[in-house]
Amino acid sequence: MASGVKVDPSCKNAYDLLHNKHQHSYIIFKIDKNDTAIVVEKVGEKNAPYAEFVEEMKKLVEDGKECRYAAVDVEVTVQRQGAEGTSTLNKVIFVQYCPDNAPVRRRMLYASSVRALKASLGLESLFQVQASEMSDLDEKSVKSDLMSNQRI
């Protein structure tokens, strides 16, 4: 079911800077107050740690009463098969945060609008985290899930 919410062009521009040019560490998106467009709400500085992203999400979701989307550049360390030592890689993940105590209408609007954002930005192939509480964004568990679901 499509919601009719459009993706603002600033979302694509910000995502290109994150994904292709690595100028940001994360982008937090929200549906605007008129429920007509998905817009960029916050952009993280280039080398901002994952913990900063989580702290910003906590501030923006008003004690778990609001939903958000995010694209986050996550750094992971891997042991490559047949190689000595480890390698550090960056992977962009997509986060859909919809807490259980957000109003039902907001949760439904975010759920029905996510497809438009993913299609507009080309996010379909990204690893996705669906979070309903802040603990779902724990850095260690997100990285562990990312590594177990990706072929690197």
Curated annotation (Swiss-Prot):
Biological function: Depolymerizes growing actin filaments in muscle cells; required for the assembly of actin filaments into the functional contractile myofilament lattice of muscle.
Signal peptide (residue range): none
Keywords: Actin-binding
Membrane-spanning intervals of the chain: none
One Pfam family this sequence matches: Cofilin_ADF
The UniProt record lists the keyword Nucleus: no
Annotated protein name in UniProt: Actin-depolymerizing factor 2, isoform c
Residue stretches making up the ADF-H domain: 4-147
Family: Belongs to the actin-binding proteins ADF family.
Primary gene name: unc-60
